[in-house]
Swiss-Prot record:
It comes from the Bacteria. GO terms for molecular function: dCTP deaminase (dUMP-forming) activity; dCTP deaminase activity; nucleotide binding. It catalyses: dCTP + 2 H2O = dUMP + NH4(+) + diphosphate. Pfam families: DCD. The lineage of its organism: Bacteria, Bacillati, Actinomycetota, Actinomycetes, Mycobacteriales. This is dCTP deaminase, dUMP-forming. It comes from Corynebacterium glutamicum (strain ATCC 13032 / DSM 20300 / JCM 1318 / BCRC 11384 / CCUG 27702 / LMG 3730 / NBRC 12168 / NCIMB 10025 / NRRL B-2784 / 534).
Amino acid sequence: MLLSDRDIRKSIDAGDLGIEPFDAELIQPSSVDVRMDRYFRVFNNSKYTHIDPKLNQDELTSLVEVEDGEGFVLHPGEFVLASTLEKFTLPAHLAGRLEGKSSLGRLGLLTHSTAGFIDPGFSGYITLELSNVANLPITLWPGMKVGQLALFQMSSPAETPYGSGKLGSKYQGQRGPTPSKAYLNFPNK
């Protein structure tokens, strides 16, 4: 069941759903708007000949902090990681789905490549996978609304929520745009 604005407010007021910093004006009829933080991860194209998900390529990305009042220009065909300004904490009975804002999609900005699902139990800042599919550069501004998080009531609470020891939840507690940890999905030799 998709939560309505009143259900979202109830969940926040009850302490089930955590959003920090919280701004009540971000609550929409069936979602919560998310804003972009000031940190971006750009790919170091000159350090690697290719991306190998099986390897820990520590220097694949570099962290860039945008100064106050400045924007970040995302050129056509470019891909960067960013992060929500808000930290989200989901209880074991709620799952989330991140979607882009249609106004930005109409400008050619994609908010996530494949990782739009937020597991119950997740706590942290959501990493955004931003792509410019337009034919002109797009300026990204820290604090701008970049997406919306829809929340779903599960049929029952997760038996093993994200962040519990059994799952090895590699992105639990993440802060800022977090690079891929896909290499942890491969068995050690």
